[in-house]
Amino acid sequence: MPGSQGVLALCENTTEVFLDVSKLLITYADNILRNPNEEKYRSIRIGNPTFSTKLLPVKGAVECLFEMGFEEAETHLVFPRSASVEKLRQVRETIAAERDQRLGASNTASSPQNASVPPVPAPPPSLSSTASAGPAAAAVPTPAPASIPFTSSSATFQRTVQSNFQHVLVYEDPELQQKALECIPHELLRSRAKERLKQANDADAACSLGEEDMLVLDLLQWFKSDFFSWVDNLPCIQCGGKTQPSGSLSPSSDDLHWDAGRVENHFCHTCQLSTRFPRYNNPEKLLETRKGRCGEWANCFTLLCRALGLEARYIWDSTDHVWTEVYSQSQRRWIHCDPCENACDKPLLYEVGWGKKLSYILAFSKDQVADVTWRYSCKHPEVLSRRTQVQETWLLHMLNKLNAERQQFLGAERKQQLLQRLLVELVEFISPKSPQPGELGGRMSGSLAWRAARGETGASNAKEDTQENVFTPSESEKESKRFHICYNVTKDCYYRVSNGQETIQGWQKGAWRTENMFRKEEHDWQMVYLARTEGASFGRMSWKFNCAPAGMKMKSASVRVFSQTFHSGTVRWSLSTNETTTEFPGDGELHSFSNVSGGTELIVEAELTGGDGSTSWQHAQLFRQSLKDTEKVLFEVMVEMEKS
């Protein structure tokens, strides 16, 4: 039957599943066609185990019933007297034709007149059960009570949930995990994590964080900065110019092999040529392509977390976003991680920062699916009013059933662990969070060490005397009598030009002092810059050069910096020596200073203040530039020296 979306969806299942389900569907239809006046054949009880276990989970099955003419009633799907028997027959024949083709026999699904399929027997009495809102319900299978209506939207919702719950098992493939691990500079990341943990311990003597917590932070930063890239529209494959979205293209066999059922057409009007953008859903392929939008980002990032041995789960938001959660053993809770934003532990980012109208957010791991909507909202009544796609009792029982099936072969200890974690989550969900003005959804709770590790407080500078970086002349710089340093914000790297192009990775590593500062990447605008942390009234950053230890003194200095402000934001630049302080503009031009002559110390400082409203922190920025300007530097200091 042309245009039957239900049959098309049904045909996407494996042959084994299709044959089982199609037999049931044909039987339901044949019972009505042969016995048009028998009411019992016009009704299917939703609580019937045959329906709930064999039809409900299968893609397209329930849609076929709706296309036949069945309608939802309170406890049943009913074929009303007003429904078209001819329409039912057409859908039935379409399914039968596909079944014949798959069986390779012409008489397997014959017409109703010749059919020998017995009528569907009367279903057994329903099993009594009651919906429980308690966490224990997640650990035991409880059939959905017959009073819960089942709708086409329920079928769509369940299919999405089951698809995601099945997909996360891909991350558990040992060979795929090994392949992913080979893509990660894990030794470097673990080294950085140890250093970050040391800084957290310095900031808070009572720090109870673990190395894995820091590893997550470094993995997020590396993934966004060095591994994966965002795609709006791909450049033209012929001229490299801009393209415009222009519908979809048919997926190739290779696309389908890598689970890309959708291929976007990015069209170049100059070349009149299409560039294909397959939306791969197979994380193995994403290790190769390393690009996409939030779906590809979260899919690949979750795999990398599992490859590193982190407990991770894939988070699906029904308002069209996905991300990851990682379980922190030290904090005994699930931590929000958004690789697109390089955001960690900021669950209110979407509702408060982005203004999203949330409704359903589900978490999927190899052992469990959970409704975690309430972690991501501080407006619970508003969210509840929007949760109308499925009934709450139906959702609860569906999740319980899926968990019971997935966990049936787990050991008692693991089951108890999952249950205990669920209890902790439920307690967390009871009290909605209250973001403070200017947080932009950033989490200000948590230990001082945790906030310091994430760069969200000036506490990371509490031990400034032991963390200050001072540049002193190397032997080659002493010989050339010249010091030259640059910083590239896109690569987040310093280049010590005068010392054999020595590189220093990380904006903090070349700084003397920093206070309330962080590096921000905007994937929507494709821009990057340094700014003060969210909620901070000011930010400060300085760089120091001292040539006295090398027996040298300064003759002159030149500085080039660039800053950008919006609304009432301000950036004040200054250059200080042992005796004087001079202010200068951050206009991107090279400014020379002769008044440094004879001095031995030089400090360049930027102070960021002002701005309006909740995004005031964004209104004063250092070194703002495109993420595509990989060679551009907007910070440069040159010092000419002579012997003392």
From Swiss-Prot:
Main location class: cytoplasm
Taxon lineage: Eukaryota, Metazoa, Chordata, Craniata, Vertebrata
Organism: Danio rerio
Protein name stated in the entry: Peptide-N(4)-(N-acetyl-beta-glucosaminyl)asparagine amidase
Domain PAW intervals: 439-644
Subcellular location per the Swiss-Prot or TrEMBL entry: Cytoplasm
Co-factor remark: Binds 1 zinc ion per subunit.
Known role: Specifically deglycosylates the denatured form of N-linked glycoproteins in the cytoplasm and assists their proteasome-mediated degradation. Cleaves the beta-aspartyl-glucosamine (GlcNAc) of the glycan and the amide side chain of Asn, converting Asn to Asp. Prefers proteins containing high-mannose over those bearing complex type oligosaccharides. Can recognize misfolded proteins in the endoplasmic reticulum that are exported to the cytosol to be destroyed and deglycosylate them, while it has no activity toward native proteins.
Gene name tied to this protein: ngly1
GO MF, any single term: metal ion binding
Enzyme superclass (EC): hydrolase
Protein's UniProt keywords contain Hydrolase: yes
Reaction catalysis annotation: Hydrolysis of an N(4)-(acetyl-beta-D-glucosaminyl)asparagine residue in which the glucosamine residue may be further glycosylated, to yield a (substituted) N-acetyl-beta-D-glucosaminylamine and a peptide containing an aspartate residue
Record GO biological process: glycoprotein catabolic process; peripheral nervous system neuron axonogenesis; positive regulation of BMP signaling pathway; skeletal muscle tissue development; swimming behavior
Stretches the record annotates as Disordered: 98-141, 455-474
Biased composition (Low complexity): 127-141
Keyword check for Iron: no
GO CC field: cytoplasm; cytosol; nucleus
Similarity comment: family membership: Belongs to the transglutaminase-like superfamily. PNGase family.
Superkingdom as given in the UniProt entry: Eukaryota
CDD domains: PUB_PNGase
